[in-house]
Amino acid sequence: HIHDRRQRQMCIRDSESMRHFFPTYQGNNEKTTLAPKLENILDDFEALLLDAFGVLNTGASLIPGIVKTLNIAREKNITLLVVTNGASNNSYKKREQLSSLGLEFSDEEIISSREAAEIFLSYNQPEGPLGVMGNIGDDLNIPNLNCIELEQDYSMFEEMNSFILLGTLQWDTVWQEILFNSLKENPRPLFVANPDLVAPHEEKFSIEPAYYVSHLVKNGIHLPFWLGKPFPTIFELAMNRINELSGRYIPLSKIGMVGDTLHTDILGANSFGLKSILMTKHGLLKNTNVGKMIKHTNIIPDYIVESP
């Protein structure tokens, strides 16, 4: 696992280099609660926000025990909501993917950073046309905004008045260069709908939008607008959705964010005032010295569990 572990440590290091534009939080003085499983701490919560990769699944495999634990949570009347930094496709595609793996959620029980982007841009419309990069789903749902898919015609870059990067499935150094040159010559708003650096799959990591955008910023491009964990827009949406799903107001102290990543799930939850639950055995921190990582980053979860 040496190469694997080194990759994971590099991800943490790259995330640390982006800390200055991530949300901040005052660390609480309460001790972190340790438990073997998420199942052991369910009674502390009335609602759970669930990251997808590293908590529900890694690539095409469900994480062992997740179905059982979520069934127990539902029996305890705990409201569940998947909150994922995935933007290249629509939320219902995530539901279909999880369903095909044997994990059932309703459409309302999934919020993606794509949805956060669509809602944010509907209320805070940038000047159009908006150049869309990395979309593999339906057209972006933003009323009265002219959205152009730049993959169809990259001669259109100069005619755009704003940009959004959804995903990096088809991204490469050529696209990176085109975007860099275009923004350097003529700075315009750039929205990034996935603040993840990487996503864990069974045997490897995929490189996600924040990785490429951090390199743009390091080379002098202005800061983008981030939409997704750890930034507050997606958590505000999630709170509204939790209260709709549960039919009541649930205090933040009774809502847990379960994630595998310190810089998105845990930092986001801590800065928003939710309880943070780090799951360590299946995602980004698998086979790493978790205590050392927490000390190094000073991002301290309220709870640490190994598995569901």
Task: Give each language-model segment a name.
Residues 1-12:
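Single conserved hydrophobic/aromatic residue that forms the stacking wall/gate
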Residues 13-49, 57:
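Positively charged, low-complexity intrinsically disordered leader regions
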Residues 40-63, 82-83, 269, 274:
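Asp-based phosphoryl-transfer active-site loop
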Residues 68, 76-153:
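Active-site phosphate-binding/coordination module
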Residues 118-205:
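HAD-like small-molecule phosphatases
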Residues 147, 258-292:
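Acidic, Mg2+-coordinating phosphoryl-transfer loop and its flanking beta/alpha structural elements
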Residues 226-265:
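Conserved Lys-Pro-Asp/Glu-containing loop-to-beta segment of HAD-superfamily phosphomonoesterases
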Residues 293-308:
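C-terminal cap/substrate-recognition subdomain and adjoining C-terminal extension
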